[in-house]
């Protein structure tokens, strides 16, 4: 009953566990991203990069600091020692950046602090383009991806983000005319200050509306380019001019920063990322269903899958499972050849499924997934899972040759060989367990390898000590004495 419950729980855990390519690991590498649009590289280096570097370089556990300056953006990566706690590293970097925020340019956006992880990888990549006969332009397709597709896919379980590649973004462009500005004595600072204020939402306190207290907000946005052209710009001398008098205001698209093409044709692409702990196969399955719904609801746009990173994961999973089955089959064949008794082989090889299946329950308990590392570990130890049972069954066979009944032989043989079986098992544990405590980046992967092997080996010990003697007592048959009075069977040519 115990092993039936463990096997049932293991099967349920196997079905409920997620399939991944490799385990999700988090490295103690923290990234600080700061943006100052329009700034020159030299300005970014002196006013942003060096100040952020100096702030984080003195933190405890820092190994290296890398900084990249590109097109108005500064990215600083702080690498800590592997022993550093990731939440502590994030808090330390965030506090250090907050401490120098007052020394950074006031017009820059607040820096963002994020941690590095192997979880956020692309699972699927799609392209979107107008269908034949559709009137949609690139701007409409881009808006469809940003608004409709992204919202629908982010509702799929396991989807972490949807990123558009290529396409265009709407932009209200203001092109200043220096001659008219000089004639009306308007500076670019006046225009910039007014544009910032017109796009700002701010709380306006509380007011009495209809006898009830209501929150009030100040909304100062414009909806169209025509509204923006009519915007009044106050000047220092008390005058005001309209923006359209000193600039050309147009509703257009921003300059593309990325391009997506398929078969030489420009399209709009989007990538689907998974979250930490989610499986590529589950995310791909849910994303495909969501895209199929979007395609059926919007026939005017054509959604095409171009990259499927979940398919190699499926192939690796199936290959690992086939390797596990082949290893188990060969182990059974070898045991049958040397035991030369199908009943003894059945008892010994029952340890294989009864050790592997409960291991999946242990994987779920530790939060491990079905990935290349854990399945490789099971395939590697599948041959040693029958060792304890073989030792037990061989000693039981020896007692049967003495003329004892199967029940008596099983009880006496199990008591006689118990310490040897336990010693063999813990010798194997001593071999595999240290891999779970390896240092460095490889140790983050081999942690699951070592614990998976140890769980399976300990499960095989449980089977050998509890189940194998019981099965032998009821399945094995007593040896019938031959005419010469011997109970041993002839060894044959293989054992000579």
Q: What residue spans do the PLM features occupy?
A:
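Interfacial helix-loop-helix hairpins and adjacent transmembrane helices
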Residues: 1, 407-411, 441-447, 466-496
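Membrane-proximal extracytoplasmic
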Residues: 1-329, 337-338, 370, 444
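Hydrophobic transmembrane alpha-helices and their membrane-interface caps
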Residues: 10-16, 21, 329-398, 405, ...
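Hydrophobic alpha-helical transmembrane segments of multi-pass small-molecule transporters/permeases
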Residues: 35, 47, 79, 273, ...
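Alpha-helical transmembrane segments and their helix-entry boundary regions
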Residues: 162, 181, 315, 344-347, ...
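Helix-loop junctions and hydrophobic alpha-helical segments within the transmembrane domains
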Residues: 306, 313, 317, 393, ...
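Internal alpha-helical transmembrane segments of multi-pass membrane proteins, especially GPCRs
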Residues: 317-325, 347-350, 378, 414, ...
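Hydrophobic, glycine/alanine-rich multi-pass transmembrane helices and their short helix-loop junctions
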Residues: 333-338, 356-373, 422-473
């Amino acid at each position: 009953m115990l092993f039936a419950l463990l096997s049932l729980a293991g099967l349920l855990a196997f079905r409920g566990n997620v399939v991944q390519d490799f385990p999700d690991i988090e490295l103690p590498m923290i990234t600080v991203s700061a943006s100052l649009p329009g700034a020159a590289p030299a300005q970014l280096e002196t006013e942003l990069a060096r100040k952020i570097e100096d702030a984080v370089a003195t933190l405890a556990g820092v190994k290296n600091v890398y900084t990249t300056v590109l097109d108005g953006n500064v990215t600083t990566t702080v690498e800590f020692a592997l022993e550093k706690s990731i939440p502590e590293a994030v808090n330390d970097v965030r506090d250090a950046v907050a401490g120098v925020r007052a020394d950074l340019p006031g017009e820059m956006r607040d820096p963002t602090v994020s941690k590095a992880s192997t979880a956020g990888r692309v699972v699927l990549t799609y392209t979107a383009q107008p269908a034949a006969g559709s009137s949609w332009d690139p701007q409409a397709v881009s808006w469809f991806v940003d608004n409709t597709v992204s919202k629908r896919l982010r509702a799929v379980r396991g989807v972490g983000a949807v990123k558009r590649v290529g396409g265009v973004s709407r932009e209200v462009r203001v092109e200043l005319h220096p001659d008219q500005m000089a004639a009306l004595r308007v500076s670019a600072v006046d225009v910039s200050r007014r544009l910032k204020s017109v796009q700002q939402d701010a709380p306006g306190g509380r007011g009495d509306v209809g006898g009830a207290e209501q929150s009030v907000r100040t909304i100062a946005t414009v909806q169209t380019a025509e509204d923006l052209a009519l915007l009044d710009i106050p000047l220092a001398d008390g005058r005001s001019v309209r923006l359209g008098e000193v600039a050309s205001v147009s509703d257009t698209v921003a300059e593309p920063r990325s391009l997506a093409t398929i078969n030489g044709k420009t399209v709009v692409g989007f990538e689907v990322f998974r979250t930490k702990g989610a499986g590529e196969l589950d995310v791909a399955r849910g994303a495909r269903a969501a895209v199929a719904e979007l395609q059926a609801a919007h026939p005017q746009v054509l959604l095409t899958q171009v990259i499927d990173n979940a398919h190699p994961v499926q192939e690796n999973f199936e290959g690992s499972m086939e390797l596990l089955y082949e290893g188990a089959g060969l182990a059974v064949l070898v045991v049958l050849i040397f035991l030369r008794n199908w009943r003894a082989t059945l008892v010994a090889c029952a340890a294989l499924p009864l050790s592997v299946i409960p291991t999946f329950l242990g994987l779920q308990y530790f939060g491990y997934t079905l990935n290349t590392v854990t399945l490789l570990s099971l395939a590697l130890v599948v041959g040693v899972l029958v060792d304890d049972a073989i030792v037990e069954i061989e000693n039981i066979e020896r007692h049967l040759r003495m003329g004892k009944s199967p029940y008596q032989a099983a009880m006496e043989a199990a008591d006689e060989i118990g310490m040897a079986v336990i010693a063999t098992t813990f010798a194997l544990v001593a071999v595999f367990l240290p891999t779970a405590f390896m240092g460095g980046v490889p140790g983050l992967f081999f942690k699951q390898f070592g614990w998976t092997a140890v769980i399976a080996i300990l499960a095989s010990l449980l089977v050998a000590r509890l189940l194998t003697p019981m099965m032998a007592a009821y399945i094995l048959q007593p040896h019938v004495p031959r005419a010469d009075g011997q109970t041993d069977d002839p060894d044959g040519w293989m054992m000579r």
